[in-house]
Swiss-Prot record:
<dbReference type="GO" id="GO:0005576">
    <property type="term" value="C:extracellular region"/>
</dbReference>
<keyword id="KW-0341">Growth regulation</keyword>
<dbReference type="GO" id="GO:0005179">
    <property type="term" value="F:hormone activity"/>
</dbReference>
<dbReference type="GO" id="GO:2000252">
    <property type="term" value="P:negative regulation of feeding behavior"/>
</dbReference>
<dbReference type="GO" id="GO:0046622">
    <property type="term" value="P:positive regulation of organ growth"/>
</dbReference>
<comment type="function">
    <text>Plays a role in regulating body size by increasing cell size and cell number of individual organs. Probably mediates its growth effects by acting as a ligand for the insulin receptor and transducing a signal via the Chico/PI3K/Akt(PKB) pathway.</text>
</comment>
<protein>
    <recommendedName>
        <fullName>Insulin-like peptide 2</fullName>
    </recommendedName>
</protein>
<dbReference type="GO" id="GO:0045475">
    <property type="term" value="P:locomotor rhythm"/>
</dbReference>
<dbReference type="GO" id="GO:0008286">
    <property type="term" value="P:insulin receptor signaling pathway"/>
</dbReference>
<dbReference type="GO" id="GO:0030307">
    <property type="term" value="P:positive regulation of cell growth"/>
</dbReference>
<dbReference type="GO" id="GO:0070328">
    <property type="term" value="P:triglyceride homeostasis"/>
</dbReference>
<dbReference type="GO" id="GO:0040014">
    <property type="term" value="P:regulation of multicellular organism growth"/>
</dbReference>
<dbReference type="GO" id="GO:0048018">
    <property type="term" value="F:receptor ligand activity"/>
</dbReference>
<keyword id="KW-1015">Disulfide bond</keyword>
<dbReference type="GO" id="GO:0008083">
    <property type="term" value="F:growth factor activity"/>
</dbReference>
<dbReference type="GO" id="GO:0008284">
    <property type="term" value="P:positive regulation of cell population proliferation"/>
</dbReference>
<dbReference type="GO" id="GO:0032094">
    <property type="term" value="P:response to food"/>
</dbReference>
Amino acid sequence: MSKPLSFISMVAVILLASSTVKLAQGTLCSEKLNEVLSMVCEEYNPVIPHKRAMPGADSDLDALNPLQFVQEFEEEDNSISEPLRSALFPGSYLGGVLNSLAEVRRRTRQRQGIVERCCKKSCDMKALREYCSVVRN
């Protein structure tokens, strides 16, 4: 009686382990990614379920009156300011080409998120564990 039970439990463990590895080798997006992270991690940073919206019930604004929202948050000064001229490059403006190159450098330096690593491409268990606050034993 114990041999069939141990055989069944061994087969179940092998199937569970192989399905987890198979999920980790493929791409993981949305709910699958959350499920696998909850299996791998004791704690991780879950996706916040609420959407960006108008201010909540604690504000005095009426969500059904869009003009009230615009009037409340519209800037007082609607004038267009002249861009700052550069002293080093008289023909160019600050905020032009030099700042756009800095923006490209900032974007390329940013660490890839879990979506870029595991949803757009396939990732392994080691990559998934990097996103855990506390790894499950």
